[in-house]
Curated annotation (Swiss-Prot):
Pfam families per the UniProt record, alphabetical: GIDA (PF01134)
Keywords noted in UniProt: Cytoplasm, FAD, Flavoprotein, Methyltransferase, NAD, NADP, Transferase, tRNA processing
Gene from which the chain derives: trmFO
Name of the protein: Methylenetetrahydrofolate--tRNA-(uracil-5-)-methyltransferase TrmFO
Enzyme class: transferase
A GO BP entry: tRNA wobble uridine modification
Enzyme nomenclature, EC number: 2.1.1.74
Organism of derivation: Anaeromyxobacter sp. (strain Fw109-5)
InterPro entries according to UniProt: FAD/NAD-bd_sf, MnmG-rel, MnmG_N, TrmFO
């Protein structure tokens, strides 16, 4: 394809992975990183690919969705996974790393690549083009650049994420839950309802108020939007606030009794197949341990709940990707701009790296005049892509960042008894489907990371 040149803005997990993949594809890369001249409040190290909040890339077990993503990225020659394997520290089946060695190794490999030039500068405006640029500036994108991205996104740029817990459908006690949309609107099975009597509601509110909360980072001022307050903050405003807010029972009579409960927790279908449900309005800063305990102990129908995702609220600059980005992760309004990483609405180190890999691959295809070939839907990479395009979610879904979870995958066919069997089936199907996608254009054999 000749010596094309692209710009990658941001040297985190997504930007580093993308820069490596592009360079391995024969493209000259200018990687623009604001450190060490300027840092976000969360960063300490001078190097690229700094792990901020944890040194863990989570489970390396390929029968978990994130472990399957690890496996796929290794097969694709991921720099991030190669560096993680080389700097691994003991952590059971989790892939945990020595942060400083990991960052130093990624930095060294990128600086040592003949087609990569690292420029240390803070970018304040989006490049005008016509050259291709990948924006991978992360959840703490600087104010000036964020304002430019917001203008591009037409208001579809969010500055905090408000994530409610998601529960596996088959762990909900259906002898307690009932299907009903408020006032009978919509298709009834889009929502499940968990009814409370007054005593159960009072006990639940008390548990929320007493529950242990996550302390905010120094760079996260606890300023909340009124439309997405943490449930415990609403509970602090008055004993009945939740019963008139996200837990209001109006229009949700129990069809088995014909009576209206004192309060309800509504569960909204999270995926098309109905394998997971979101606890509506339950964004929270309770610790994950407390979320599990309180929701299982105090919410009728969730005693045996298995959580696909737990709730959180934190500073996180992210685009409403399904509406702002095309399927190849380029901006619909300015196609020379591509986006990757947490700014697109993926959550987690590995997911960010995977998104960077996908964007780089799309850019290589654009430069070569080829159509972008998305990853197969049943792979972990494909599941993330389905999230970014909105394909994994039902109509009207409130787009929020997510980790890779099996709820994003297309439903399995056939019978699979038990959770372990379903995970095995997902993994085996993904392995078969990823193989022909790894190198469809016969240009990624050189994509393997250097030792």
């Amino acid at each position: 394809m000749g010596r094309e040149r692209v710009t990658v803005v941001g040297g985190g997990l997504a930007g580093s992975e993308a820069a490596w993949r592009l360079a391995q594809g024969g493209v000259e890369v200018e990687l623009v990183e604001m450190k060490p001249g300027r840092r976000s409040p969360a960063h300490v190290l001078d190097g690229l690919a700094e792990l901020v909040c944890s040194n863990s890339l989570r489970s390396d077990n390929p029968h978990n969705a994130v472990g399957l993503l690890h496996e796929e990225l290794r097969r694709l020659g991921s720099l991030v996974l190669s560096a993680a394997d080389a700097t691994r520290v003991p952590a059971g089946d989790a892939l945990a790393v020595d942060r400083e060695r990991f960052s130093a190794l990624v930095t060294g490999r990128l600086r040592g690549h003949p087609l990569v030039r690292v420029r240390q500068e803070e970018l304040l405006r989006l490049p005008e083009g016509p050259g291709l640029t990948l924006v991978a500036t992360g959840p703490l994108t600087g104010d000036a650049l964020a304002a430019d991205v917001a203008a591009l996104a037409g208001g579809r740029l969010h500055f905090y994420d408000a994530i409610a817990p998601i529960v596996a459908a088959d762990s909900i006690d259906m002898s307690i839950a009932y299907a009903r949309s408020r006032y009978g609107k919509g298709s009834g099975d889009d929502y499940l309802n968990l009814p409370f009597d007054e005593g159960q509601y009072r006990a639940f509110v008390g548990a929320l108020l007493a529950g242990e909360k996550v302390a905010a980072h120094d760079f996260e001022e606890p300023r909340y939007f009124e439309g997405c307050l943490p449930i415990e903050v609403m509970a602090e405003r008055g004993a009945d606030v939740l019963a008139y807010g996200p837990m209001k029972p109006v229009g949700l009579e129990d069809p088995r009794t014909g009576r209206r409960p004192f309060a309800v927790v509504q569960l909204r279908r999270e995926d098309v197949a109905g394998t997971a449900y979101n606890l509506v309005g339950f964004q929270t800063r309770l610790t994950w341990t407390e979320q599990r305990r309180i929701l299982r102990e105090y919410v009728p129908g969730l005693a045996g709940a298995e959580f696909v995702r737990l709730g959180q609220i934190h500073r996180n600059t992210f685009l409403e990707a399904p509406r702002v980005l095309a399927p190849d992760l380029s901006a619909r309004e300015r196609p020379h701009l591509f986006f990757a990483g947490q700014i697109t609405g993926v959550e987690g180190y590995v997911e960010s790296a995977a998104c960077g890999h996908l964007a780089a691959r799309a850019m290589l295809d654009r430069l070569a005049g080829r159509p972008f070939l998305p990853p197969p839907a049943a792979t972990a990479l494909g599941a993330l892509h389905r999230h970014l395009t909105g394909e994994a979610h039902p109509p009207g879904y409130d787009y929020q960042p997510t980790n890779v979870v099996f709820a994003l995958f297309p439903p399995l066919t056939g019978r699979h008894r038990g959770k372990a069997a379903r995970k095995d089936a997902h993994a085996e199907r993904a392995r078969k489907e990823i193989a022909p996608w790894i190198d469809p254009w016969t240009h990624t054999a050189r994509g393997a990371a250097a030792p």
